[in-house]
C-alpha cells in the first residue's frame, strides 16, 4: 500500500527534469569520494520549494563540496543570494574551487568556521 508520503515524494520527483551536467559530475565524484551530499529526492524537493517560494536569501549550514549551494544557485531566481557555512578544513578549498568554477554570478558566499559562532555575527536579510 502506497502511503501519503510516498505519493507526495513520487509527485515531487515527477516534476524533476534532472540536473545540469556539472552537478551530475559533482554528485558522481562525491559518491565516489564518500562525501555526503543531498539525495535525489531532496534535490527534487529543493527545486520544487525554490520554484514555489522564490527566496531572496538562503542560509545553508554545512556545504561540504558546495553541491547543494550550487544546485540552489542554479534553480533559484537570478537575484537570490546564498550564504553557506563550512568548518571542515579539508572540504573548504574544494567548495571554493567549485564556486569559482560554477557560480559565475557570485550568488554564493562561503563563510569558513563553526556555524554556532558565525551565526551570531549574521544579520537578517
PLM segments and residue spans:
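A short alpha-helical cap/connector motif
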Residues: 1-125
Amino acid at each position: 500500500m502506497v502511503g501519503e508520503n510516498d505519493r507526495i515524494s513520487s509527485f515531487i520527483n515527477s516534476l524533476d527534469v534532472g540536473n545540469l551536467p556539472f552537478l551530475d559530475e559533482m554528485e558522481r565524484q562525491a559518491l565516489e569520494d564518500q562525501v555526503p551530499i543531498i539525495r535525489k529526492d531532496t534535490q527534487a524537493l529543493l527545486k520544487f520549494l525554490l520554484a514555489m517560494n522564490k527566496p531572496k536569501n538562503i542560509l545553508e549550514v554545512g556545504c561540504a563540496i558546495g553541491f547543494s549551494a550550487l544546485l540552489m544557485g542554479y534553480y533559484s531566481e537570478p537575484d537570490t543570494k546564498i550564504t553557506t557555512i563550512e568548518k571542515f578544513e579539508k572540504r573548504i578549498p574544494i567548495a571554493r574551487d567549485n564556486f569559482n568554477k560554477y557560480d559565475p554570478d557570485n550568488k554564493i558566499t562561503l563563510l569558513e568556521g563553526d556555524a554556532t559562532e558565525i551565526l551570531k555575527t549574521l544579520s537578517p536579510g
